[in-house]
Amino acid sequence: MKNFLISGMLLIFASASVYAGGYRVAAQGQRALAMGHAGVGVVNSAEIAFFNPSGMVYLEDKFTVSAGVTGVFSNVKWQNRSTGQFAETQQGAGTPFYLHAAYKVNEWISLGLSVTTPYGSSVEWEPDWAGSHLVNDINLAAIFIQPLVSIKLSEHFSIGGGPIFVTGNVNFNRNASRTLTDEQGNRSNITVDDTGVSNTGWSGSFMFTPVKELRIGFNYRSEILLNAEGGEAVFSNFPNSALTPQNGTTTFNATLPLPAELTIGFAYEPNEKWLFAFDYQRAFWDVYNSLDIEFGNPNVPTSINPRNYKNASIYRFGAQYKATDNVTLRAGYYFDESPVQAGFFAPETPRNDGNGYTAGLSFQVSEKLAIDASFLYLRFQEVDASYDSYLENGQSVPFSGTYKSNAFLPGLGVTYKL
């Protein structure tokens, strides 16, 4: 029983790390999001600080700020067609935000700051549903803070980047098994909680402008290892038995890797009214070979759990049209490959390949202030899949079914310049 619970605890952290990457929230700027979240070659606001910091030096104004928030409304339905069992996630909203600022020191150097929440989400299933031994609910938040510098080496080429400081927290609850209860019939469950999980990384980028109508961009964001040390694991509603853990708390240490990302793309502006953008993004998911957890209780051995993820790509397309002096319209699309391989599809992160459809606009309130709005409809392809790494009494007990998922993301922001 204790070995089984260790595997379950390990699954908790595997799911948390997936939410920090595999279910990455692409909402780091309303203007970019409205164009399929393509932005590595687009210089139209301080959002460039996140997408390609080397482009900050091309902003025309002395000081530019972009800030906003997006609502994430997701829905997942699961069904076992053999048994007829059905479950659906509870409606909730995530609220990723961003704050970008760029300051032009002179014509050759700009400084910037980017504060974002690219990894943060939540899922809440119905209480004691068929997969409650894998997850009841999860909440994760991670904040990226990036001081940046952009240097123009010539009229056609610039570089940029800086360190990344990350801090976050995670809370996860699951039932201990498919059937275990205490003497009163309450399902035995485990809650894991940790705050202040942190570490550092870096980003580097360049922008090449061969002609004034075309910008080619490259951005690399490093792998970041989030170190959870002394986190709290709470065991609740366990029966009074020598074969099960006692109710109470223990500590744990774990390292949660966030994969590196590489983005390359371009923006083409044939005239003053139109702009077209394309980004290719590669996330290096193969860092998730396994995940190790060391427990504070000396009677509980360290566990190793294989994840076997694969690298995945995202293809982003966007367009912008300046309709009037005050209104700019945008639209886009992206295709997002899932890094999850067969046999590793868990309900903590129920995502398959996804298609994102986006639109939005900017309204110029005054010479200095603009309001930016975007909307994303994200639909994941229906999939029949299973999670095969759950163990009971040393035996694999696959959890399988059909998943249907989608998400709506309306967003609002402002751009201010001096």
Predicted region positions:
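Hydrophobic alpha-helical membrane context
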Residues: 14-15, 64, 384
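Bacterial N-terminal signal peptides
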Residues: 7-15
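Asp/Glu-centered strand-loop micro-motifs enriched in Gly/Pro and often flanked by an aromatic residue
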Residues: 38-40, 44-45, 85-89
